[in-house]
């Protein structure tokens, strides 16, 4: 699997504390290997789709931080990363 990091994801990531950045990198490694890795707790966000109509997923970085993404074939499109409240604006 490969990743496409949107500009919004890159900005969100840049603003994270260093310890959360490290955990996020680990979470992305887990995602690359296995969408169902237990620490990610990945799930589709009910009623959320990206502009192309793909389901939006959320996964866990830490207790307080999440990231959102869509799946397009063999590619993960990373939309947002940050505190739990990013779920209000996942794309």
Predicted regions and their residues:
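Flexible domain-boundary/linker segments
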Residues: 26, 41, 45-48, 76, ...
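N-terminal first-folded block
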Residues: 5-41
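A short, surface-exposed loop/turn module that caps and links secondary-structure elements
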Residues: 30-60
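Short, mixed-charge, low-aromatic patches
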Residues: 1-3, 45
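Enriched for short, Lys/Arg-rich terminal
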Residues: 2, 10-18, 22, 51-54, ...
């Amino acid at each position: 699997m490969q990743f496409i990091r949107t500009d919004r994801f890159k900005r969100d990531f840049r603003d994270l504390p260093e310890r959360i950045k490290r955990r996020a990198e680990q979470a992305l490694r887990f995602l690359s290997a296995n969408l169902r890795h237990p620490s990610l707790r990945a799930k589709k966000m009910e009623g959320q789709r990206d502009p192309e109509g793909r389901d939006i997923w959320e996964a866990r970085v830490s207790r307080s931080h999440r990231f959102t993404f869509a799946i397009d074939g063999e590619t993960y499109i990373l939309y947002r990363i940050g505190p739990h409240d990013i779920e209000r604006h996942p794309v």
